[in-house]
């Protein structure tokens, strides 16, 4: 540093530049802060603490001398406040005066006492400001309900938002039906598999059922006769067994439904009187409403004259049941009436044609089943959508 006795203080370690180079107490050297050739560091004017912190000085004096700053005595120099002129410039400025109402809201000046009085005569406005029976002119007039007045005023803005709870409850029913339908379908499909396993086990009493088609020219692995692949010769026999099982299950369901409807009196089949012809006159059941009407009951087998007796035409229960199902389906699905000519033509075919159809189903049935099997779960979905929508 040469002859410059001013020591720079970049880190603020030395207190206020009161360091004596010769470590002489009470030296006559001038205050180094008054030296015009000193280094002006940012922390040069800050008052520091003693060598060992405030309030702790060794008995023989500190390393920095006996000056007050070296002994850890802090002196605070009051700072003069800024002038009053700059105090307003740095702080919040005063709020200016508000302009008059006639300049900011000219439309409010149009509401004079006459216009306001005429507006209050509107019953919708009166219902908002005056209670029932109240009046500004002293006349007691009936006042509409406030809710109805508000709704009438707001009716021009558009329809209210639909209630989402009603929409959610309307969709919950079909979703539950679809879930129950899929669950029932999975359980129903396990019934034919169980019956097929029982059927094939009759040919292998005490042995493990094995498909006999694996010994043919087709190189396939050993498998059960209830799980034949399409290339196995026993695949068509498996389809035939399952088709017969499905027909038996359907027949049992129809018989159960027929017994239930007959027990409830929904199939009024007129019995034959012994020793009479196909038609008889006598007491008969009351004729029910046909399926084309408001009820789902089938047509009665007899006509009822005015004298209380009716002419009964005996028909079998199965025919009455089939007629009932056809009329119910025709009422629900109007397009079934277009199939009547085709069904009549199909029924009138010769036995040769029927055998040909059975043979085609036997030959092409497995291939069609592989094509249509992915779409089978969609049938209950379409049925539920048709019924509920």
UniProtKB/Swiss-Prot annotation:
Q: Where is the lipid attached (N-myristoyl glycine)?
A: 2
The subcellular localization recorded is: Virion membrane
What family does the Swiss-Prot or TrEMBL record give for this protein? Belongs to the orthohepadnavirus major surface antigen family.
- Stretches assigned to the Virion surface side: 2-170, 264-337, 388-389
Q: What name does this protein carry?
A: Large envelope protein
Assembly notes: Interacts (via its myristoylated pre-S1 region) with the host SLC10A1/NTCP; this interaction is essential for viral entry.
Q: How is it used?
A: Systematic vaccination of individuals at risk of exposure to the virus has been the main method of controlling the morbidity and mortality associated with hepatitis B. The first hepatitis B vaccine was manufactured by the purification and inactivation of HBsAg obtained from the plasma of chronic hepatitis B virus carriers. The vaccine is now produced by recombinant DNA techniques and expression of the S isoform in yeast cells. The pre-S region do not seem to induce strong enough antigenic response.
Is Transmembrane helix among this UniProt entry's keywords? yes
């Amino acid at each position: 540093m040469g002859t410059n006795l001013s020591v720079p203080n970049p880190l603020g370690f030395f207190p206020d530049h009161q360091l004596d180079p010769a470590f002489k107490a009470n030296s006559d050297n001038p205050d180094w802060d008054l030296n015009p050739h000193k280094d002006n560091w940012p922390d040069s004017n800050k008052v520091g603490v003693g060598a060992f912190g405030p309030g702790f000085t060794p008995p023989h004096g500190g390393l920095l001398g006996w000056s007050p700053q070296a002994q850890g005595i802090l002196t605070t120099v009051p700072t003069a406040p800024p002038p009053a002129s700059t105090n307003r410039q740095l702080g919040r400025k005063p709020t200016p005066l508000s302009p008059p109402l006639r300049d900011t809201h000219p439309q409010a000046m149009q509401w004079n006492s006459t216009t306001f009085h005429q507006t209050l005569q509107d019953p919708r406005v009166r219902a908002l400001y005056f209670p029932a029976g109240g009046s500004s002119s002293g006349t007691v007039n009936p006042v509409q309900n406030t809710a109805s007045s508000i709704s009438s005023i707001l009716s021009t803005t558009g329809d209210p938002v639909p209630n989402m709870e009603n929409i959610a409850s309307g969709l919950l029913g079909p979703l539950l039906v679809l879930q129950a339908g899929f669950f029932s379908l999975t359980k129903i499909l396990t019934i034919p598999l169980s019956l097929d396993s029982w059927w094939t086990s009759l040919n292998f009493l005490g042995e493990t059922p094995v498909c006999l088609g694996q010994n043919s020219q087709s190189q396939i692995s050993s498998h059960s006769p209830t799980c034949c692949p399409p290339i196995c010769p026993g695949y068509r026999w498996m389809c035939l067994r399952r088709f017969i099982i499905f027909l038996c299950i359907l027949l049992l369901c129809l018989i159960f439904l027929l017994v239930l409807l007959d027990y409830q009196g929904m199939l009024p089949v007129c019995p034959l009187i012994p020793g009479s012809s196909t038609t008889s006159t006598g007491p008969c059941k009351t004729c029910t409403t046909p399926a084309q009407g408001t009820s789902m009951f089938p047509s009665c087998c007899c006509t009822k004259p005015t004298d209380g007796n009716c002419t009964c035409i005996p028909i079998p229960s199965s025919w009455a049941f089939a007629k009932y199902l056809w009329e119910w389906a025709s009422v629900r699905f109007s397009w079934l009436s277009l199939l009547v000519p085709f069904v009549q033509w199909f029924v009138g075919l010769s036995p040769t044609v029927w055998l040909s159809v059975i043979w085609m189903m036997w030959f092409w049935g497995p291939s069609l089943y592989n094509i249509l099997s992915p779409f089978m779960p969609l049938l209950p979905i379409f049925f539920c959508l048709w019924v509920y929508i």
